[in-house]
């Protein structure tokens, strides 16, 4: 069994876990998440713990660790939630919340409107910051990556949309 799958996932108070065949549903204060688990993984809920083990085989060991990590992210998501911070660096780069989307001005000839999916909300503490929050870690990260993809940070001046904790590797300009 994988090292990750050996550790059980603790179920905190206020979280309800239901298991139907290979579908697991986790309900908490911030919402509920549902995921289909791989058929090579055996999931057992007992004594406020979720245990994952694999059917015999080398490939399935990795699947058990993956399933355990995904279930842990579901439990953390419905209790605490996930957040990604983005910074807009560049002259005239601005962001504001417009309805169910983020209105971005990133130096193009037109403003961009990125629609937010259900389960992800955005807040702009300032014109150059976006904070995305939600219960699904994958979905929050996906939306952040899509917004960053409009204008990724470039290595010469560092302009663009970057994650708050991202270090942009800078290059020196070409010399004559």
Swiss-Prot record:
Alphabetical list of InterPro entries matching this protein: Ribosomal_uL6-like, Ribosomal_uL6-like_a/b-dom_sf, Ribosomal_uL6_a/b-dom, Ribosomal_uL6_bac-type, Ribosomal_uL6_CS
GO CC term (a single one): cytosolic large ribosomal subunit
Gene3D superfamilies xref list: Ribosomal protein L6, alpha-beta domain
Keywords noted in UniProt: Ribonucleoprotein, Ribosomal protein, RNA-binding, rRNA-binding
Composition-biased stretches (Basic and acidic residues): 156-170
Gene Ontology MF terms: rRNA binding; structural constituent of ribosome
SUPFAM superfamilies: Ribosomal protein L6 (SSF56053)
TM segment ranges: none
Region feature Disordered, mapped onto this chain: 156-176
Gene Ontology annotations of biological process type: cytoplasmic translation
Superkingdom in the source lineage: Bacteria
Similarity comment text for this entry: Belongs to the universal ribosomal protein uL6 family.
Quaternary structure annotation from Swiss-Prot or TrEMBL: Part of the 50S ribosomal subunit.
Function as written in the Swiss-Prot or TrEMBL entry: This protein binds to the 23S rRNA, and is important in its secondary structure. It is located near the subunit interface in the base of the L7/L12 stalk, and near the tRNA binding site of the peptidyltransferase center.
UniProt name for this protein: Large ribosomal subunit protein uL6
């Amino acid at each position: 069994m994988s090292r990750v799958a050996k550790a059980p996932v603790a179920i905190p108070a206020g979280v309800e876990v239901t298991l139907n065949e290979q579908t697991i549903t986790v309900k908490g204060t911030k919402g509920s998440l549902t995921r289909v688990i791989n058929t090579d993984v055996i999931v057992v809920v007992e004594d406020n713990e979720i245990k994952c083990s694999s059917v015999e085989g080398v490939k399935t060991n990795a699947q058990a660790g993956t399933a355990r990590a995904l279930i842990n992210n579901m439990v953390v998501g419905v209790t605490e939630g996930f957040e990604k911070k983005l910074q807009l660096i560049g002259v005239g780069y601005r962001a504001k919340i417009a309805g169910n989307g983020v209105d971005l001005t990133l130096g193009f000839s037109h403003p961009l409107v990125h629609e937010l999916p259900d389960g992800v909300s955005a807040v702009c503490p300032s014109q150059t910051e976006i904070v995305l929050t939600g219960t699904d870690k994958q979905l929050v990260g996906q939306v952040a990556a899509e917004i960053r993809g409009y204008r990724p940070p470039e290595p010469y001046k560092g302009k663009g949309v970057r994650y708050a904790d991202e270090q942009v590797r800078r290059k020196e300009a070409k010399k004559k």
